[in-house]
A protein has these predicted regions:
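N-terminal secretory/targeting leader peptides
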Residues: 2-6, 15-113, 122-287
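Polar helix-capping/helix-linker motif
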Residues: 117-118
């Protein structure tokens, strides 16, 4: 139903005759929900709602460039599109947390209200164009993340002392202040690092998103929900030159599909998180 509703919002000219495009999308994901109901969902719906005029090939993290620097890959023209999380640019510009979520922020529902009804999308677009020279829209928004999947119990702030933790964004700096030893790495590297003991614990996504990551096999202690990330909107980045070649109708199509996927992503993840809680319990994890 949601796809049909979105189709009604797309100008008729966008899905009728017009230019054709064969674009590449760089991502920060090795797989899982971020890839399937985020990146690939966007590509599939662009194809459907354009009448087949937009063909977007989606690449896993690292295939076209550094998985943590997707905006750079897109800006340099290696890919026309990218799907990333703006918080990865925290070290470059702390302003990014306003659009990627941060510790103690409001929840996803209120973040969506701000983005789509109170000017957040327009502010994000202006910020990224002025600072990075790229076009930016929200693409996907998750519910509260799991705070930790840990190889050892973490029950008090004292237990964070010296904890080798994989994280990113503003929480990395906060975790340092709490005595942890945080590092940032792409999602595809997290499980191997946990397995060989290079890190003690990780945060990544919501409970549902973390199932395919396999953390439950080796990190048996979970803290949920994560106050470090009550919401996490993701980002569609577009090469400015490629964007400039689109008609106004096709630009509207891109915006509409990005909004559709964002809402659908939030609904899907929120629904699946409840079932995921039971999955981790049955897997012998302590929550």
């Amino acid at each position: 139903m949601s796809a049909a509703a979105a189709a009604l919002a797309v100008p008729a000219a966008a899905s009728a005759q017009g230019a054709t495009y064969n674009w590449k999308m760089a991502t920060g994901w090795s797989g899982g929900p971020l890839m399937e109901i985020g990146s690939k969902a966007f590509a599939e719906r662009m194809d459907q709602l354009s009448g087949g005029r937009f063909k977007i090939q989606v690449f896993p993290g690292g295939a076209l460039g550094n998985a943590l620097k997707v905006p750079e890959t897109v800006k340099n023209g290696i890919a026309e599109l990218g799907h990333t999380w703006m918080g990865y640019d925290w070290g470059k510009d702390p302003t990014t947390v306003l659009f990627g979520g941060y510790a103690g922020s409001f929840d996803t529902e209120r973040m969506l209200h701000w983005m789509y009804e109170a000017g957040g999308v327009e502010m994000q677009r202006k910020f990224r164009e002025e600072t990075e020279g790229i076009i930016s829209f929200p693409l996907g928004a998750r519910t509260a993340e799991a705070f930790l999947h840990s190889r050892k119990p973490v029950k008090t702030l004292a237990d964070l002392k010296g904890l080798k933790l994989r994280t990113a964004g503003a929480w990395l700096e906060m975790a340092k202040d709490l005595g942890a030893a945080p590092v940032t790495t792409a999602g595809g590297d997290v499980y191997p690092m946990l397995e060989r003991g290079a890190i003690d614990a990780t945060e990544w996504g919501t409970l549902y998103e973390n199932i395919p990551m396999g953390f439950h096999k080796i990190a048996k202690y979970i803290i949920y929900p994560g106050v470090h990330q009550p919401t996490a909107p993701f980002e569609l980045v577009i090469n400015k030159e490629a964007w400039g070649k689109l008609s106004d109708a096709d630009k509207k199509l891109v915006e509409t599909v990005a909004r559709l996927v964002t809402i659908d992503f939030w609904l899907k993840v929120g629904h699946e998180d409840a079932k995921a809680l039971e999955f981790f319990k049955k897997a012998g994890n302590t929550i």
